[in-house]
Amino acid sequence: DMVWEPIYPINRYTFLPEWRDQPFKYKFDSERINKFRRLITSPFINDEVNLLTEELLEKSTLAKDEIPDLLALTYYAGNYNHKSTQECAMEMQDTYVRLDRSIGSLLDLIDRKVGLHNVIFCIASTGYADPEAPDLGLYRIPGGEFYLNRCATLLNMYLMATYGEGQYVETYYNQQIYLNHKLIESKQLNLAEIQNKSADFLIQFSGVNEAYSAHRLLSGPWSPQIELARNGFHRKRSGDLLIDVLPGWTIVEENVTDSRVVRHADVPAPLIFLGGGIKPETIRVPVNITRIAPTLSSAMRIRAPNACTATPLNF
């Protein structure tokens, strides 16, 4: 049976005043409820990844010929059981300590099986984190609650007052509102005009930072903010309207037990290259993810992917 306890004495961990600072102990035996769901959010899952990697290197033809192979591994470094940092601050810190050891074990494994001189490592992170609880009032951070369902209802009332009776809002999901294209077409209305008018209406809501129409994202002028919105937009599957909520506000879904706090703060993530004759160096310049593939290709002295438009990093 696996048991997770702090790897260091309690005084080695740091806490903010409102964080829980009591030692933890989690068991992952066969009789526990949701054992595997909890296990995959613990640092023990990274040890399982290493065991699977060792089995792969022993039983497959990976790294056994002259043709370069790609092995992509994902380690977990998030909150235990998707709790907030306030609830599991010690677990979060302990996870990072154990993650460091898991990566060290992987390097030792690769060195034994393949040889570090034959491998190029690329370590990156998504910067993703589970939604946190709202900031306590003692920090005096502005905030509020934004209800997407109420917003969609009011938008439909506005469109009915403007264009006549009908269900103009078809549905809403994940800060996106989908309009009823069949109704708009049957009324012989201009879809782009309705999208833009709807965006102008939504921007007046409390808690709304920006409202983007599909027409604006596809045909409007470029800006850094527009570029970020476009990266997550698909013209055939995304909504007609994309709502950007102010940081500090909580997006509440009344029909489901789901809510999350919007945060726009930058979450830096490391990008580490090791091997392939790369000299030790620290580059403190923001790097776009599109430069990873050409950099790896350059280090291996092969051509970059045919859809790659970025240039490699200079070491």
Describe each PLM feature range:
Residues 53, 68-76, 92-107, 120-128, ...:
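Beta-strand elements within well-structured catalytic alpha/beta cores of enzymes
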Residues 1-67, 76-83, 206, 210:
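His/Asp/Glu-rich, glycine-adjacent segments
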